[in-house]
């Protein structure tokens, strides 16, 4: 039905002697609630629908007066001695006959007792069959929209509405109110709808403000008697039609209705309403997609946590684990049956504006093209829009139901990271598993370089120390290898070689060198502490605890507090307790605080670890490796900005500190600043091209920064091209 028909009505007159009518508000009522015949059938189905009886008296004497219709408007203006209260007390002060006489006097329009000025009635009273009462009631609701005044309904009799009728009125009145009061605020619209629903006793738990049968039994009796008197001159339906026609003539006829409606709800108003509906629909769909992505994030978060327990550094930096980690952090999402990079808030907002809000404005186009014939087409457009919405939602559900895990893994294999097929991912995963198993078998075995120009050098140890001091770590490692090949029992040579590999971001070689140093000198405290730190970096807690306990057991100051029998059953809590005792014995020992920081990193108590390292830095402020440990702990504690500051302190003390350069890049990447992280990885690799972990980090940042054009250079390890493209 077009809106013009709802507003203008047809040319035919009401059918005499019946309740059917072609008047616009009658049609509007039928459009909202269905025809009167259907309503009468529903009323007949309700058992005892018209039965009313006395209800329990649960109001006090004063509450009965305040609960009369309209009393909520009068209450702020009436004082305890006001004439309104005296009027009601007059009713209660007489006997039954006196009450009847007073009521007859009111009905006959006799002179009223002197009263102060009251509010003029805004809405008429309603009487007649339920369908006619409801039609008049909704008519008054529509009238309030034209006048722009708050809807203050008069009491209505019990209509016997079914639950489906109430639901229909609740839903449609809310929709129509937003059309009628489009130029008013949301608070006004809600108050209008609430007043309508409350008067019809629709909302559960809301006490109706209208007349409630049973509160005033005497007045109910007179009400029922007055309703039994039917005026003989006009049929009720004809009377209604006559009143409406007279009202239409008084207000200028149908044309003035259309003009008034267009003024209040013109083209722009409907375009705005439609735009809001579309925005809400899109938000709902986005929330549905977000829920699915949240579920995927939760599953991958559990998987990532399980995989992260593995200690192999190459597996920790594998592309498979990186993929799972990015899914768990929400950096990858499922969209249109594909795995895609999650857009930043600014990006999707810009995309939305370009697609839906860009010039020419779709709202203006909608207003010019779709509503060029006035408001009579709005009903058809609204029905069509609803059908399209439901179709779109069904299609989305059907598409998502077809999604399976294998599909999105295959899509990702060709997506953000840049591999050409899913087989590449499977092969890469198998490769890292093999390396993981091989790493366990060869753990502790030092691998010498194939080509070493320092073999045969007269003083390789001295040369290695000088190169290490200059920060040329790769060259220093070669010189120190030549030294330990010449003197295999040189514990200091092995120790310095292990330190060089650790600073060069190669913990596996560092551990192997330190183990050879321990074989040569089992009680060397620096070696034991370095082994504990390296195994902590490899997430090997049990082994790390063994070496840290060995450091305490062999220390001349603290050996007495470390019982020998504890070595058979090492627990983190016991070791931490012993080192806390040591810190109390000697608070000025920076090494004790360093070990405590390492222990708290093992238990992931990062705040306590940060405190321990900061205490140690107060004692050794120029220890660049200690600044690096603090930065790594802050990064693990999701304090990447603070970590960058700590790494910078380490680099200021030692500019060629490869591990600090790589860690700086990791901190930027953890903040989503992938473009900024790339130059730091390139700088670290320029100083140590053999740092496999740094190559993996660089490749990931290139992919996340959408620099697929440089991935080939990363794969071929073309440092010249990378340094030229990403200078620092």
Swiss-Prot record:
Coiled coil: none
Effect of a null allele: Peroxisome-defective phenotype including an absolute requirement for sucrose during early development, high seedling lethality, and delayed development.
Entry's induction text: Up-regulated by hydrogen peroxide, the absence of sucrose and by dark versus light conditions.
Tissues where the protein occurs: Expressed in flowers, siliques, leaves and roots.
Mod. after translation: Monoubiquitinated at Cys-13 by PEX2 during PEX5 passage through the retrotranslocation channel. Cys-13 monoubiquitination acts as a recognition signal for the PEX1-PEX6 complex and is required for PEX5 extraction and export from peroxisomes. When PEX5 recycling is compromised, polyubiquitinated by PEX10 during its passage through the retrotranslocation channel, leading to its degradation.
Sequence motif WxxxF/Y motif 3, location on chain: 270-274
GO annotation terms (biological process): protein targeting to peroxisome; protein transport; response to auxin
Motif WxxxF/Y motif 6: chain residues: 378-382
Crosslink (Glycyl cysteine thioester (Cys-Gly) (interchain with G-Cter in ubiquitin)) position: 13
Positions of disulphide bridges: none
Locus of motif WxxxF/Y motif 2: 257-261
Extent of motif WxxxF/Y motif 8: 408-412
Residue ranges of the motif WxxxF/Y motif 7: 396-400
Region ranges (Amphipathic helix 1 (AH1)): 11-97
CC annotations in GO: cytosol; peroxisomal matrix; plastid
Entry keyword set: Cytoplasm, Peroxisome, Peroxisome biogenesis, Protein transport, Receptor, Repeat, Thioester bond, TPR repeat, Translocation, Transport, Ubl conjugation
Amphipathic helix 4 (AH4): region residues: 392-417
Cell location: Cytoplasm, Cytosol; Peroxisome matrix
Repeat positions for TPR: 491-524, 590-623, 625-657, 658-691
Signal peptide residue numbers: none
Residue spans of the Sequence repeats: 240-244, 257-261, 270-274, 348-352, 362-366, 378-382, 396-400, 408-412, 425-429
Chain location of the short sequence motif WxxxF/Y motif 4 per the record: 348-352
Name of the protein in its database record: Peroxisome biogenesis protein 5
Organism: Arabidopsis thaliana (Mouse-ear cress)
Organism phylogeny: Eukaryota, Viridiplantae, Streptophyta, Embryophyta, Tracheophyta
Gene expressing this chain: PEX5
